[in-house]
Amino acid sequence: LAPRDIVARSIALHMRETGENCAWLDATHIDHFHERFPTVTEGCQEIGIDPQTQRIPIAPAAHYQSGGIVTDAYGRTDVPGLFAVGECARTGLHGANRLASNSLLEGLVVGGRVPALAVQRCQTRGTISRHAIESAWRNDTAAHQHDFPLGDTPVQRRRERRALQQLMSGNVGVTRDAALLQEAAQQLETLYETLSRRMHDTVQLCRIITEAALLRTETRGGHTRLDYPKPDPQQRYSRVFSLGDDGKIHHETCVNPRPQLR
């Protein structure tokens, strides 16, 4: 079996060339499929497909994010007392791609280190009164009471999330090019102004991903630019994005990002 990024890229290119919304996996030759892959069998049966006798529709899906909050190998960030572990973190252990099961090992190693550091930090810091916590919560709630209007219903949120998913999958998915990314960037600007405040953080993250993909004019690891199909040795670095006090997204390049511990 080829690595996931190669399989996903092949499927995405097939869908792009044919205009179909999936590729087809023929597993009918595998004996006792339901015993070897019970979860897949159950999922297929829920949509009326018998994988023992019928082809299975497949398409790439977002699975793992190689980037994330910049941390060191102990889960520490540049925010004092804030630790990040797992898929939300960028430790640098994966590079531009990820080998299968590496994320599990990363979580076990870094996750095993964080508790001792957190306890050590708590022992050297003072306590916060319950009154101070409740007061901060009330102030924050009052400051954002108009962020979620009465019309912000579960149906509306599902509709907004679906629109965002379709845009990101279609334009910023497995295969990318400048035209698709620029179109996505423009639409994300509009969505940020029109979607409910509840979606703002998600849209901001989508904007950062899109901007990062536009700036990286090469193909490297899990990032595939159809208009730049080869790696560029001059771009062997990472980009660190942040939200400035002016509300704008800023970025800087560095070879091996590490948090500025304080």
Segments from the language model and where they lie:
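Glycine- and aromatic-enriched mobile tails/lids
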Residues: 11-14, 64, 70-84, 88-262
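FAD/FMN-dependent oxidoreductases across multiple families
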Residues: 38-83
